[in-house]
Curated annotation (Swiss-Prot):
The lineage of its organism: Bacteria, Bacillati, Bacillota, Bacilli, Bacillales. Belongs to the class I-like SAM-binding methyltransferase superfamily. TrmB family. CDD domains: AdoMet_MTases. The keyword GTP-binding does not apply. Gene3D superfamilies: Vaccinia Virus protein VP39. One of its GO terms (molecular function) is tRNA (guanine(46)-N7)-methyltransferase activity. The active site is at 118. This is tRNA (guanine-N(7)-)-methyltransferase. It catalyses: guanosine(46) in tRNA + S-adenosyl-L-methionine = N(7)-methylguanosine(46) in tRNA + S-adenosyl-L-homocysteine. It comes from the Bacteria.
């Protein structure tokens, strides 16, 4: 999908540096000090327009949330969502997911959320899928070999690929749903994409995968 350029995005992010952390690598190993507490840190890789992470922050004030989004044209909307909720326990990073280990120390993160990631269906693009082994290794590092990944998608092919990838990597699947909205799962916070898919009656797939020490 082509992202529409927003020439004012840089200035807007700079004006909201209390939400979008510039030069986040300087806080590696120090993220608890950024939030001013020792609460668990959960990250969302590909936070998009911010509805999920803002909703989670409101629902769970005792958890610190960090949303990671590569595209400035998208993260500016996430900034607006965070400002609207006035949630003090959420920060945003305008970085590539490949930089996780540059930004977080080993074991500094407690959970990783992946919501409606780009499926990259062509085989030659497999390395770009956020659930391939290369990315799992990055998550494992910042999670310190513990914690969990919570993954949601509307794409059956990506879901099946991810289940296999998680299992082959040695993760334990503790929750699997082939139709989340028809399950008894409680506390679900929907993304913008999820609302659209649900309105069309499309099933939402969800899995929780854990590292066991």
């Amino acid at each position: 999908m082509r992202m529409r350029h927003k020439p004012w995005a840089d200035d807007y992010l700079a004006e909201n540096s209390h939400i979008v952390i510039s030069e986040p690598s300087q806080y590696k190993g120090k993220w608890h000090s950024v939030f001013g507490n020792d609460n668990p840190i959960h990250i969302e890789v590909g936070t998009g327009k911010g509805q999920f992470i803002s909703g989670m922050a409101l629902q769970n004030p005792d958890v610190n949330y960090i949303g990671i989004e590569l595209f400035k044209s998208v993260i500016v909307t996430a900034v607006d969502k965070v400002k609207q909720t006035e949630a003090p326990n959420v920060k945003l990073l305008n970085i590539n997911a490949n930089m996780l280990s540059d930004v977080f120390a080993d074991g500094e993160v407690d959970r990783v959320y992946l919501n409606f990631s780009d499926p990259w269906p062509k085989k030659r693009h497999e390395k770009r899928r956020l659930t391939n082994h290369a990315f799992l290794k990055k998550y494992e590092q910042v999670l310190g070999g513990k914690g969990a990944i919570h993954f949601k998608t509307d794409n059956r092919g990506l879901f099946e690929y991810s289940l296999t990838s998680f299992s082959e990597y040695g993760l334990v699947l503790t929750f699997v749903s082939l139709d989340l909205h028809q399950s008894d799962f409680e506390g679900n916070v929907m993304t913008e994409y999820e609302e659209k898919f649900a309105a069309k009656g499309q099933p939402i797939y969800r899995v929780e995968a854990e590292w066991r020490t």
